[in-house]
């Protein structure tokens, strides 16, 4: 525009100059000369030089380029895209160029939708962080299905670094179980229980759930065996009675038997004990269980410095602290090193002394031993002290067992103490050696292969699963468990009260095998128990 206005001005200026300088007569000649000079000049070059700036200025001055329809452009038509998509003539064209354009548009639309979704999720995650704090916001975002932010937008790295955990588990663990500094920085609510989050942390100590761990750490024996043994009968899935001397038991312990080492703990199976005594309606047994549960956290429960290295003589001195060590050693030698038989002999000696006229007032060691037997059969030891006169003591209301002797029992029932008494698990078959258990000829016919001494039965039950089942021997009637090695009901003073007879009374009725020349021979007199 300016160029067109400038180009005609050159001859006009020449004519004006000519008219001003030259005479009016020669004006036509001067105009012709000026036109010839202008024609002889390189006008094309001057025009190109003069046209370039107006073109650039025109591009800068105009509005930005509007989007055009690609389909129309493929077919040689230029049309603005605004409001044109519906009315395009080639909107349904299937040529190669239009198909390529349609595919490109579909890919671009998918990318735009993905970026829009990611931006929305990041905004939601930031809102949750502002509301609940960093760690809880991430947890809620994961719970709601919101994708966590990408590493380029990671804002949790500093929190995870302070907590010392990974990005996956460190953030939830740091929210509830982390350091106090991180909790002070983050204003958050307790949306997750702290115990569960502490359990996920590897450095968090897990307290025992009410049960003290055994010294060897294998406390899973009574937990796994007691619930399975409880529903069955005592004669089918009881503990093996193979107390064939302490060397064999020690060898089995060194071989890695976890059940004998862990089942003898005083608190190892206390939670299972009410289930073993309550189904047959023993009130005194449940009361004794409650007393033992209260007296469970005693110093005797903690494992000694070397419970596995305790000798049979040490076991006897723990069970009978009132006896001299030399006397207990002689009794152990007379029994051939069998700890259970030695304990039976000492108990028979005390039982004989009670029958001779000592009465219910038992000395301190007798009370301790009675507490030891009562731990296997709760509330049934008083029958031995009663001597068969009148009703047995378990029928009287109220607990009569001295609970203050339980620490001694807990010390005596440590895994090391009972580890040498039992070398079988709760699922091993019973020992078919009847003479080894001292079953007499008057036992049941089926009890010959399963002849069990009551005290041995009690200690076997305590060694197997710490009074988990105890074979239900104190509660058995004549028709309930006929395979146990007890005398028929007519030998007892109260045949109609067979459910309440105790192991001590059953052991006092029939004579145990004696050892001639020993200090503690068979001194049991069966007449006080007879009517």
From Swiss-Prot:
Signal sequence range: none
GO biological process: cerebral cortex regionalization; dopaminergic neuron differentiation; neuroblast proliferation; neuron fate specification; positive regulation of neuroblast proliferation; regulation of DNA-templated transcription; skeletal muscle cell differentiation; stem cell differentiation
Keyword DNA-binding: yes
Pfam families associated with the record: DM (PF00751), DMA (PF03474), DMRT5_DMB (PF20624)
Top-rank lineage group of the source organism: Eukaryota
Domain DMA: residue ranges: 310-345
PROSITE patterns: DM_1 (PS40000), DM_2 (PS50809)
GO cellular component, one term: nucleus
Locations listed in the record: Nucleus
A GO molecular-function descriptor: sequence-specific DNA binding
Keywords: DNA-binding, Metal-binding, Nucleus, Zinc
Tissues/organs with expression: Expressed in adult brain and testis, as well as in embryonic ovary, kidney, heart, lung, stomach and brain.
General function of this protein: May be involved in sexual development.
Protein name: Doublesex- and mab-3-related transcription factor A2
Organism: Mus musculus (Mouse)
């Amino acid at each position: 525009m300016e160029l067109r206005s400038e180009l005609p001005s050159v001859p006009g200026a020449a004519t004006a100059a000519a008219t001003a300088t030259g005479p009016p007569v020669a004006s036509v000649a001067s105009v012709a000369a000026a036109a010839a000079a202008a024609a002889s000049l390189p006008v094309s070059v001057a025009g190109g030089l003069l046209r370039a700036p107006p073109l650039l200025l025109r591009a800068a001055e105009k509005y930005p380029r509007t989007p055009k329809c690609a389909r129309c452009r493929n077919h040689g038509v230029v049309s603005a895209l605004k409001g044109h998509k519906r009315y395009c003539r080639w909107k349904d064209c299937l040529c190669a160029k239009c198909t390529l354009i349609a595919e490109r548009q579909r890919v671009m639309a998918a990318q735009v939708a993905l970026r829009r979704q990611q931006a929305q999720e990041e905004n939601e995650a930031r809102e949750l962080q502002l509301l609940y704090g960093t760690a809880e916001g991430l947890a809620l975002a994961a719970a709601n299905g919101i994708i966590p932010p990408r590493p380029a937008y990671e804002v949790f790295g500093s929190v995870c670094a302070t907590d010392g955990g990974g990005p996956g588990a460190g953030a939830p663990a740091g929210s509830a179980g982390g350091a106090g500094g991180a909790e002070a920085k983050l204003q958050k609510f307790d949306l997750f229980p702290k115990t569960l989050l502490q359990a996920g942390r590897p450095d968090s100590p897990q307290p025992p759930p009410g049960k003290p761990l055994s010294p060897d750490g294998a406390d899973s024996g009574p937990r796994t065996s007691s619930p399975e043994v409880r529903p069955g009968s005592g004669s089918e899935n009881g503990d093996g009675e193979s107390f064939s001397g302490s060397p064999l038991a020690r060898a089995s312990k060194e071989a890695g038997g976890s059940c004998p080492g862990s089942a003898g703990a005083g608190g190892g199976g206390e939670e299972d004990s009410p289930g073993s005594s309550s189904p047959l309606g023993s009130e005194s047994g449940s009361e004794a269980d409650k007393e033992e549960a209260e007296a469970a956290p005693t110093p005797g429960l903690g494992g000694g410095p070397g419970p596995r290295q305790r000798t049979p003589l040490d076991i006897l001195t723990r069970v009978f602290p009132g006896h001299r060590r030399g006397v207990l050693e002689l009794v152990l030698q007379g029994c051939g090193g069998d700890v259970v038989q030695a304990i039976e002999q000492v108990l028979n000696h005390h039982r004989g002394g009670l029958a001779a006229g000592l009465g219910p007032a038992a000395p301190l060691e007798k009370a301790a031993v009675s507490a030891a037997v009562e731990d296997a059969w709760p509330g049934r030891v008083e029958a031995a002290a009663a001597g068969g006169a009148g009703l047995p003591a378990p029928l009287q209301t109220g607990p009569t067992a001295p609970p203050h002797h339980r620490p001694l029992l807990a010390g005596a029932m440590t895994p090391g103490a009972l580890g040498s008494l039992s070398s079988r698990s709760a699922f091993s078959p019973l020992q078919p050696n009847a003479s080894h258990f001292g079953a007499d000829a008057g036992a049941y016919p089926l009890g010959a292969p399963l002849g069990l001494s009551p005290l041995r039965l009690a200690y076997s039950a305590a060694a197997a699963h710490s009074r988990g089942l105890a074979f239900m021997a104190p509660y058995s009637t004549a028709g309930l468990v006929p395979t146990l090695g007890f005398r028929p009901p007519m030998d007892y003073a109260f045949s109609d009260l067979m459910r309440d007879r105790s192991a001590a009374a059953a052991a006092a009725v029939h004579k145990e095998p004696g050892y001639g020349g020993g200090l503690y021979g068979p001194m049991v007199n069966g007449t006080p128990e007879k009517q």
